């Protein structure tokens, strides 16, 4: 049986999916607040930079591991403000997170042109060559089989479609790296306990960040899935990186 990491523990693929689903079910109600607290609000700036990689909003966009909908709703608002005709599909494997995304969309009056699909990133229920853009933010490291998810991204994109991924990465050497590691492993789980009542969930999230491949290694994985013109841009000295590629 194939094994992968759930944080620092070795589990089989099916077990990881169940455990990850439990993590996000347990923290769903505090998810947005925790993102603000953990990143000191920086995640909003990272996401603003991320959506700049989508210049054409008259498009079919698939947002995978959509979570509470931050990326898709930013794109929907931008399209509405510009008068663009965007079609957005939000996909996530967790029902509670999708429910929160729907509620936010209704509250922001952005529900029009949005579709919501409960699905795994490694087994998307969409036809080949369906989307102009595939976006995934802070989600791919939680997928049990990352290579399979990348191949699925390639499959559902149209020719010349663009893959864009925002993910935690490897901080460059220096004082920031040491502080970041201390903060991540010692402070964030304590915040998770105080705010979300779940220290273990945030221990997993930090461990998953620590184990995620470096920028260059992930770039190779994207290329091996079939993509071309694969690039990345570090943000905040490499705390996160935006990866982009094309299906040609």
From Swiss-Prot:
Record field: catalytic activity: a 2-demethylmenaquinol + S-adenosyl-L-methionine = a menaquinol + S-adenosyl-L-homocysteine + H(+); a 2-methoxy-6-(all-trans-polyprenyl)benzene-1,4-diol + S-adenosyl-L-methionine = a 5-methoxy-2-methyl-3-(all-trans-polyprenyl)benzene-1,4-diol + S-adenosyl-L-homocysteine + H(+)
Cited CDD domains: AdoMet_MTases
EC number of the protein: 2.1.1.163, 2.1.1.201
Tagged with keyword Transferase: yes
Keyword Transferase: yes
One of the protein's GO biological processes: aerobic respiration
Domain of life: Bacteria
Pathway: Quinol/quinone metabolism; menaquinone biosynthesis; menaquinol from 1,4-dihydroxy-2-naphthoate: step 2/2; Cofactor biosynthesis; ubiquinone biosynthesis
Entry-linked Gene3D superfamilies: Vaccinia Virus protein VP39
Stored InterPro entries: SAM-dependent_MTases_sf, UbiE/COQ5_MeTrFase, UbiE/COQ5_MeTrFase_CS
Single GO molecular function: demethylmenaquinone methyltransferase activity
Binding site for S-adenosyl-L-methionine: 68, 92
Keywords, in A-Z order: Menaquinone biosynthesis, Methyltransferase, S-adenosyl-L-methionine, Transferase, Ubiquinone biosynthesis
Family: Belongs to the class I-like SAM-binding methyltransferase superfamily. MenG/UbiE family.
Function: Methyltransferase required for the conversion of demethylmenaquinol (DMKH2) to menaquinol (MKH2) and the conversion of 2-polyprenyl-6-methoxy-1,4-benzoquinol (DDMQH2) to 2-polyprenyl-3-methyl-6-methoxy-1,4-benzoquinol (DMQH2).
UniProt-listed NCBIfam families: MenG_MenH_UbiE, PRK00216.1-3, PRK00216.1-5
Name of protein: Ubiquinone/menaquinone biosynthesis C-methyltransferase UbiE
Organism: Rickettsia canadensis (strain McKiel)
Gene that this sequence comes from: ubiE
């Amino acid at each position: 049986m194939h094994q992968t990491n759930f944080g620092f523990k070795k589990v089989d693929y099916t077990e990881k999916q169940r455990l990850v689903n439990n993590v996000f079910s347990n923290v769903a109600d505090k998810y947005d607040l925790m993102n603000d607290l953990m990143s000191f609000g920086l995640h909003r700036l990272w996401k603003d930079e991320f959506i700049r990689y989508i210049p054409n909003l008259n498009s079919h966009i698939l947002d995978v591991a959509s979570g509470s909908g931050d990326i898709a709703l930013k794109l929907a608002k931008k399209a509405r403000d510009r008068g663009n005709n965007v079609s957005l599909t939000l996909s996530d494997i967790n029902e509670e997170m999708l429910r929160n995304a729907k509620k936010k969309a209704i509250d922001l009056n952005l529900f029009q042109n949005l579709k919501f699909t409960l699905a795994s990133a490694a087994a998307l229920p969409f036809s080949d060559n369906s989307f102009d853009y595939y976006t995934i933010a802070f989600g791919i490291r939680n997928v049990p089989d990352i290579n399979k998810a990348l191949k699925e991204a390639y499959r559902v994109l149209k020719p010349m479609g663009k893959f864009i991924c925002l993910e935690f990465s490897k901080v460059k050497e220096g004082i920031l790296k040491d502080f970041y590691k201390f903060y991540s492993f010692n402070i964030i789980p304590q915040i998770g306990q105080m705010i979300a009542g779940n220290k273990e969930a945030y221990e997993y999230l930090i461990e998953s960040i620590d184990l995620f491949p470096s920028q260059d290694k992930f770039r190779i994985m994207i290329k091996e899935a079939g993509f071309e013109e694969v690039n990345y841009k570090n943000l905040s000295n490499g705390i996160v990186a935006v990866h982009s590629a094309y299906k040609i």
